[in-house]
């Protein structure tokens, strides 16, 4: 007989820094086991925010799927800024190159709703514009 799913939650933790807390307690899962497995699974992504989808079952067991780091976090890291512009229409807080956009899009491809790298790049460019980050080299991009 299949296990009954009690809850599915989308959370974000820093890689290798998941700790038992209120977010996990509300799921009713074995918190020490989750934190140990999550921290082991994210060893190669140290310092990054890691979104995770946790499926909790009625017997306190769980499954989780790691997602790619959020686009906004990656753009801030590449642009070396702490936060985006408060008004992206009038402020530019940083600039990034089209090559930076391409590398982010290639990394994010599995989680994006895009069939081509160009479509993924357009999504990343849209996020950058909304954050007040200017993209250089756009004349080469269609």
Curated annotation (Swiss-Prot):
Molecular function as annotated in GO: large ribosomal subunit rRNA binding; structural constituent of ribosome
Mod. after translation: One or more lysine residues are methylated.
Keywords attached to this entry: Methylation, Ribonucleoprotein, Ribosomal protein, RNA-binding, rRNA-binding
Record carries keyword Oxidoreductase: no
Organism domain of life: Bacteria
Keyword hit for Nucleotide-binding: no
Family annotation (CDD domains): Ribosomal_L11 (cd00349)
Gene3D superfamilies with a match to the protein in the record: Ribosomal protein L11, C-terminal domain (1.10.10.250), Ribosomal protein L11/L12, N-terminal domain (3.30.1550.10)
CC per GO annotation: cytosolic large ribosomal subunit
Gene Ontology biological process terms, A to Z: translation
Cysteines engaged in disulfide bonds, as pairs: none
Recorded coiled-coil stretches: none
Function: Forms part of the ribosomal stalk which helps the ribosome interact with GTP-bound translation factors.
HAMAP family assigned: Ribosomal_uL11 (MF_00736)
Subunit description: Part of the ribosomal stalk of the 50S ribosomal subunit. Interacts with L10 and the large rRNA to form the base of the stalk. L10 forms an elongated spine to which L12 dimers bind in a sequential fashion forming a multimeric L10(L12)X complex.
NCBIfam families membership: L11_bact
Family indicated by similarity: Belongs to the universal ribosomal protein uL11 family.
Record-given protein name: Large ribosomal subunit protein uL11
Source species: Mycoplasma mycoides subsp. mycoides SC (strain CCUG 32753 / NCTC 10114 / PG1)
